[in-house]
Structures are given as structure tokens and as C-alpha cells.
Amino acid sequence: MNIHKIKYLAVLSMILDHMSSVLFAPDTIGYIILKLIGRIAAPAMCFALAQGFIHTLDRKKYFLRLIIFAVISQIPYAYYMSGSIWFPTGNMLFTLACSFLLLEVVEHHKCLGILSIPITISILYITTFTDWFIFGPLFTLSFYINKENKDLQALSHACISFLSLGYSAYVCMQQGLSWYSQVWQIGVILIIPITYLYNGKLGNKSDFNKWFFYLFYPLHLLVIGIIRSRL
């Protein structure tokens, strides 16, 4: 399985995740199943980013694309999340941009020296205001630093996945809900068998494959947000 196929898998799971609240009432079997499958999207995007960071010919352009489309996607994201043009957290592309910066810090930690510590803390702090909290960067980092060992990738991802599940349980209890209200969050571990299927290849280097995800992300949020607002 090449990286483009993993991206399209992320697209499919993202659609299922975001359509769950349109098609089903919360806590129904259908809703839980779609949310569980939909959890593949974020770690799949993080995995693709880690591989993109390794293989891209121009990291500056890669980062610039992430930032530009993160800004473009923010209003569609806010509309999907709240039905208005404002939402207090940044969308997933901001999370990926922060993850990209974190990989840069790891790559240049010898040059940065002791500065790499406050920079890393600052990046992780920023992601507390974006989608997927600090877990997006941690997923990405685990995929990157263990890129030569799929078993370590799987183990580290599983550990971070259970940390994210624990955090989700804590948030649920803080909101007066049962700790298991979002147990479907454990679906993030479903990326593990997919990482074993990855063949190290990019896939077809067409402009369509290059730009599809960047365009799909804001458009699908806007469309689903409109559909949900009219139900």
C-alpha cells in the first residue's frame, strides 16, 4: 500500500466520521461504528505527514501549503463544528503544521541544542488549541522516529493511543459524562495494520494526488456542515 492509498483511506474514514452525527443519533450502534472507523483518519494523516517530511523535495513549500490550507479550512471547520464562522480550536491542518515543525526540531536538535526543549514545549502547547490536542504531533513523531522499525512504530502508537483514550475519558468525566462515553476513540489503533502494509512508495505523482486532499478537507467540512444545519 503506497502513501496515496493511505491518504485516500484517511479521506474515506474522515467522511464516515464526520457523517456519523448526520446519519445517526449519538451513542447508537451506527454512530459508534462510524466514529470507530473514522478514528483512522487522524493517525493516517499523521503517518502520511511523517512520510511526506522524509520524502519531499521542498520542505518549505510543503509547510507553506499546510499553513495556507489550514487558514482556508478554518471557517469551514468552524461551521462544521459549531454552525458559525467561529470555533475556539484550529483545524487538523494546523495540527499537521505544528507536527511538521516538531519534526524539524527533531531533525535539527543538535544545532538547536538546549533550545530544542522550549521550542518543543511551545509547539505542543500550541496544539492544545487545535484539533487532536497534543496527540496529533505525538502520533507523527512516533511514526517518524521509528520509521525504520514497524514493530516499534506499532508499539509506540499503541501507547500514545491509550494515552489519548485516557485523556478522552478524563474530559468526559469532567463534563459529567461516563468515562466510556467516547470509547470509540480507541479506533486510532486501527492504523497499525495499515502501517505494516505500507510499501515505502509514494504512488502516482500526479497533480490530482498532490492537491486533492488539500481541496477535499475544507470542501467536505463545508458540505457536511450545511447538510447538518438543514436537518
Predicted regions, residues:
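Alpha-helical transmembrane segments and their immediate juxtamembrane cytosolic regions
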Residues: 1-231
